[in-house]
Design a protein with these regions (language model features):
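A beta-strand edge to alpha-helix "cap/lid" segment located at domain peripheries
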Residues: 2-6, 53-128
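Short, low-complexity N-terminal intrinsically disordered segments enriched in polar/charged residues
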Residues: 1-29, 128
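A solvent-exposed, acidic/Ser-Thr-rich amphipathic alpha-helical stretch
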Residues: 5, 21-24, 28-74
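Poly-acidic low-complexity segments
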Residues: 19, 33, 120-124
Length: 128
């Protein structure tokens, strides 16, 4: 299996375990990370830590990669089933943020074996 995909699988595993430090070690110091709740991006490892710490006080997301595809320009797109529950494990109702149950495309750009950029797109599988 591709080493970059192994890195991404570890990131998903550590994210679902709420092991922020386990994820941050796989990111470059200057990472650009999509903010799925509010839009835009956060920049740097500590900003990613703050983003997830805030997110996990409001919702309980779980992300399950079901396929990976490397694009011609070297990015890796993961098709991901995203489920988001409230802190009691119940389905969300009436949320105003962008997180909800759906299948999405996570686009990763790696540099020297670490994630340098992460974006979110609507899932289009197989990728175009």
């Amino acid at each position: 299996m591709d080493e970059d995909i192994k890195v991404l699988e570890r990131i998903y595993d550590r994210f679902n375990a709420r092991d922020i430090d386990g994820v941050l070690t796989a990111l470059t110091n200057d990472v650009t990370w999509a903010n799925g709740m509010d839009g835009g991006h956060v920049h740097g490892r500590e900003a990613v830590r703050e983003y997830w710490t805030r997110q996990w006080t409001m919702v309980s997301p779980h992300v399950e990669p079901v396929g990976f595809h490397r694009t011609v320009d070297g990015a890796i797109i993961a098709e991901v089933r995203q489920t988001v529950r409230d802190l009691e494990g119940k389905p969300l109702q009436g949320q105003t943020h962008g997180l909800k149950d759906k299948t999405v495309g996570h686009v990763f750009r790696l540099r020297e074996g670490k994630v340098a950029r992460f974006d979110i797109q609507d899932a289009a599988w197989p990728p175009r």
